[in-house]
């Protein structure tokens, strides 16, 4: 028997203005207000609830994925139903896949770890693991 694994790497940087703590309009994301909303509409949201012949399907249940902590933090606040669908798919997968889910942790930011200094590598990994455990 042959197997295939499809991996989805999902990441959006923190786009908030540090002075205001809010997302500001991004003209290049039109017709949406910002890139988080645009990518959510085109990718993250539709994969959580995809129409199929006999109903709806959560594609995240069938993918191996990693989600950036900054994306999940935004999604937890702004799109909680999709956030919950992602968390739920990982927990459901844990009972079917040797005790582990189908989502894996990633470094906190989108750093290229082999190019980072040892202190930054350790920080990225620790922060990423702690965020993963929180979720």
Residue ranges and their predicted role:
Residues 1-135:
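Carbohydrate-active enzymes and regulators
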């Amino acid at each position: 028997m042959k197997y295939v694994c499809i991996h989805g790497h999902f990441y959006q940087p923190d786009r908030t203005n540090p002075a205001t703590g809010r997302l500001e309009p991004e003209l290049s994301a039109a017709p949406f207000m910002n890139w988080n909303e645009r990518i959510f509409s085109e990718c993250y949201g539709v994969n959580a609830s995809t129409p199929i012949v006999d109903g709806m399907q959560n594609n995240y249940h069938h993918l191996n994925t990693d989600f950036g902590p900054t994306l999940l933090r935004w999604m937890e606040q702004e799109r909680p139903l999709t956030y919950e669908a992602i968390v739920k798919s990982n927990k459901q997968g844990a009972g079917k896949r040797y005790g582990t889910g189908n989502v894996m942790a990633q470094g906190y930011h989108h750093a290229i770890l082999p190019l980072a200094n040892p202190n930054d590598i350790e920080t990225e990994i620790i922060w990423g693991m702690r965020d993963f455990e929180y979720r």
